[in-house]
Swiss-Prot record:
UniProt similarity note: Belongs to the SurE nucleotidase family.
Underlying gene: surE
Organism name: Methanococcoides burtonii (strain DSM 6242 / NBRC 107633 / OCM 468 / ACE-M)
Annotated positions binding a divalent metal cation: D10, D11, S41, N96
Keywords: Cytoplasm, Hydrolase, Metal-binding, Nucleotide-binding
Stated name of the protein: 5'-nucleotidase SurE
Length: 261
């Protein structure tokens, strides 16, 4: 029986990255594409509970897709329970245009949020992201994003093939894959842990023509991190693979908390 794969992202169903992701798994089984109709970066694992959702079926570059009027997590939920009507064997979220590394992105990335939603149903999940060297590229029209995805496609294909055959190791719900911008066929692969920080958060205040203030959440990237982290791997030009668990319980002796009670 052919494997069933659900493909989603957070950059939107028309983004170049999801077409590359489709190429990475199209030979591994039946691929269902269910992704946001609009750009949804930074929404994390949010779901729409105060408005109805609509599905638009269309074809993009010969690929049948389902454009969801909601978040990446909405897209996974509708993909499983309305479109496929069964659990897939694998969920792939990506390729995100922009790296998703450090604890900063685990809770804010729609790419990772969608993968975590699938993982919550016991489905092995992969999130795949591509580093960009200019931050502004993340905010451009990603339909026409130009990049050679071939190395990333080949790498994700190999990982997905093995996950479909063997599943994920115990206590691993998601593999967070980040591909460096200048990746090569022989680029080193590192199994990494999450760096603590990647962004130095700030707020920029501006004034509208009437003199009233408005604000942009901004900040700079942090380019230094401990050895063994995803940020460090990407800075070295290595492919980063971080195993993620849904269980966010701190691995400490609970007696250390008792004095706070």
């Amino acid at each position: 029986m052919s494997k069933r794969i659900l493909l989603t992202n957070d950059d939107g169903v028309y983004a170049a990255g999801i077409r590359a992701a489709y190429r990475s798994v199209s030979d591994l089984g039946d691929v269902t594409v269910s992704a946001p109709a609009q750009q949804q970066s930074g929404v994390g694992r949010s779901i729409s509970i105060f408005e109805p959702l609509r599905i638009t079926r269309t074809t993009i570059d010969g690929i049948e897709v389902h454009a969801i009027g909601g978040t990446p997590t909405d897209s996974v939920i509708l993909g499983i329970f309305t479109i496929m009507k069964e659990l897939p064997d694998l969920i792939l979220s990506g390729f995100n245009i922009g790296e998703n590394i450090s604890t900063d992105t685990i809770t804010t990335s729609g790419t990772i949020g969608a993968a975590l939603e699938g993982a919550s149903y016991g489905v092995p999940a992969i999130a795949a992201s591509l580093q960009v060297t200019e931050e502004g590229l993340k905010f451009d029209d990603l339909r026409d994003f130009q990049h050679d995805f071939d190395v990333g496609i080949k790498f994700v294909n190999g990982v997905a093939k093995k996950v479909l055959k063997n599943g994920l190791p115990e206590n691993v719900d998601l593999l967070n894959i980040n591909i460096p911008h200048f990746v090569e066929e022989d680029s080193e692969v590192e199994i990494t842990r999450l760096a603590r920080k990647f962004f130095r958060t700030g707020v920029e205040e501006r004034r509208d023509p009437r003199g009233r203030p408005y604000y942009w959440i901004a900040g700079d990237l942090i380019h230094t991190a401990e050895k063994g982290t995803d940020v460090n791997a990407i800075e070295k030009g290595h492919i980063s693979v971080t195993p993620i668990s849904l269980d966010a319980t701190s691995p400490i002796n609970f007696s250390e908390i008792e004095h706070l009670m």
